[in-house]
Amino acid sequence: MLTDLHKVRNIGIMAHIDAGKTTTTERILFYTGVNHKLGETHDGASTTDWMEQEKERGITITSAAVTCFWNKNQINIIDTPGHVDFTVEVERSLRVLDGAVAVFDAKEGVEPQSETVWRQADKYVVPRICFVNKMDKLGADFYFTVDTIISRLGAKPLVMQLPIGSESEFIGVVDLIEMRALVWPGDAKGDVTMGAKYEVQEIPADLQAKAEEYRAKLVETVAESDDALLEKFFGGEELTVAEIKGAIRTMTVNNEIYPVLCGSAFKNRGVQPMLDAVIDYLPSPLDVPAIEAHDPRDEEKVILRHADATEPFSALAFKVAVHPFFGRLTYVRIYSGRVDSGAQVINSTKGRKERIGKIFQMHANKENPVDFVTAGNIYAVIGLKDTTTGDTLSDPANEVVLESMTFPEPVIEVAIEPKTKADQEKLGTAIQKLAEEDPTFRTEQNQETGQTVIKGMGELHLDILVDRMKREFNVEANVGKPQVAYRETLRRTVEKHDYTHKKQTGGSGQFAKVQITLEPLEVTPETSYEFVNAVTGGRVPREYIPSVDAGIQDAMQVGVLAGFPTVGVKATLVDGASHDVDSSEMAFKIAGSMAYKEAARKANPVLLEPLMAVEVRTPEEYMGDVIGDLNSRRGQIQSMEDASGVKVVKVNVPLSEMFGYIGDLRSKTSGRAVYSMQFDSYAEVPKAVADEIVQKSKGE
């Protein structure tokens, strides 16, 4: 473990699904000596994809943190997922990174998901270098990929290397700073070094002119960034390698440019120079600004925390995972101070004390125990009981709260029915564990059907959650179709509705009479129901009043229109009557429930549906098709604006119209548009659509 922070890099590898991100990470681990056998994503054996579903689908879901060493520098890699349903994981990893390597597919250029992840990295101001991967692929085109970085991302790439050959002829790269060729020996002879050795050669004659042209552009960009260098440049002096690298580092750390390198991770070419670039150009924890924290007792008070071992301890928990052997592992980024194994800290987000158990430096799924941790590093800790994703840990004498990560509300749900009683118990355990790991996953019990309803961020998200329940927790269950979470509400006031509950069957009977008024109530995040007791003269004994309230609330769970929960109701108990012998809490609960059901039918009940705030980023040429499609989905356009080479459309669309949208958007825009959506509000469903939903709910 290094305490010299100049030599530490906390980086993420970010990319579109299938651009070769996991293979690139694998190669880094191989060349830095952590892995002795290469795991290929194609065979489902890679080191960072350690959950079963990831191995099967060949996609990375959970960002595992891996530490490795390169030329006496320490690199902590956070593997980020590249699928749109996992953007919460991506955003979470970006919060704790200092820099990133953006991997692009040399044939496809900037793909939709690379654009989404790039925009998220912009939001967190993460410096990046670009690695144009898959140079060995049929149709690979380095120059086209660089053009798409400009046209689709609106970014300023700085070409640092040129490819020597492409497709099956790709053998190495031209290093434009040192003006030399790096060539990897062909592995047709079964090259035993797996690309670990390369030769430095003269630049091939047919590339000399192009190399000089790109070198001139590079030197000019460097010179313009610094007055002293500009003077030297105009004076006709050569800039030294150290001056060029220093200027590129400054510009990269400031997000002014993005160095571009190329290679083929799969064919083991170009990975080592990319590692050199990570060390040369990406920031160390000392290069990034101090993190802003708040005083837990005074939100307004800002406290700065620097990457300094002598400052009070502060850290952010950015991931909780369940390890098969150690149980609960909490991944933390240490922002300031140091902490020893066994020390007591405070979870300042929740105000609870925690004890740090064992501390590990993680290598994908192996772990290396350490005695203490210091600022600027990323570790996994066991022993934290109450800490979940996004919580701050700090020194009990100097509490701070690092800005909490805010997570969107889940919008899609699916019912799960365990097959046996034993499965019901396993499901309970699974839900608790998964909710600890993933803050965007919620559950509730459907009172009427007894089914467990799980909620998530999208169709793939729910698929994976259900899959994990079955596989990791052995839950056998029937799974329903994804459903939209509709609600009902009342639009009209119904005054003084009477209901009498009477049952006379020998012995003591049941008797309760109530008179209620129902009124529409504005729904706010705090209130969606209000009960008022306006009974005078003890006509309903005081002890029965809560029963009437409970009866009304029970009835509201299953709406009168289509059985969906009802919101936005003010119920007033106006009058009633009781019987000395036959009245009971149960009788009044039933009376309250039935009175509500009858009155609600007269109160003009309507259906509400979740509206999603959708943001689509599309190249201008597809704008007409995109808007036409959104209109056909009952979308209401909120705004249209320009952003670095693309049009941004903000629109509110009912969730029910968004199923399968990703496929339609891809086909309408050749996969170039991207969208994100999150819950906005509930709105009334138009009558024609509502009638259809009501009929469906009644099985007509």
UniProtKB/Swiss-Prot annotation:
Gene3D superfamilies: 3.30.230.10, 3.30.70.240, Elongation Factor G (Translational Gtpase), domain 3 (3.30.70.870), P-loop containing nucleotide triphosphate hydrolases (3.40.50.300), Translation factors (2.40.30.10). Residues 6-286 form the tr-type G domain. It comes from the Bacteria. SUPFAM superfamilies: EF-G C-terminal domain-like (SSF54980), P-loop containing nucleoside triphosphate hydrolases (SSF52540), Ribosomal protein S5 domain 2-like (SSF54211), Translation proteins (SSF50447). PROSITE patterns: G_TR_1, G_TR_2. InterPro entries: EFG_II (IPR041095), EFG_III (IPR009022), EFG_III/V (IPR035647), EFG_IV (IPR047872), EFG_V (IPR035649), EFG_V-like (IPR000640), EFTu-like_2 (IPR004161), G_TR_CS (IPR031157). The keyword Kinase does not apply. It is found in: Cytoplasm. This is Elongation factor G. It comes from Leifsonia xyli subsp. xyli (strain CTCB07). The gene is fusA.
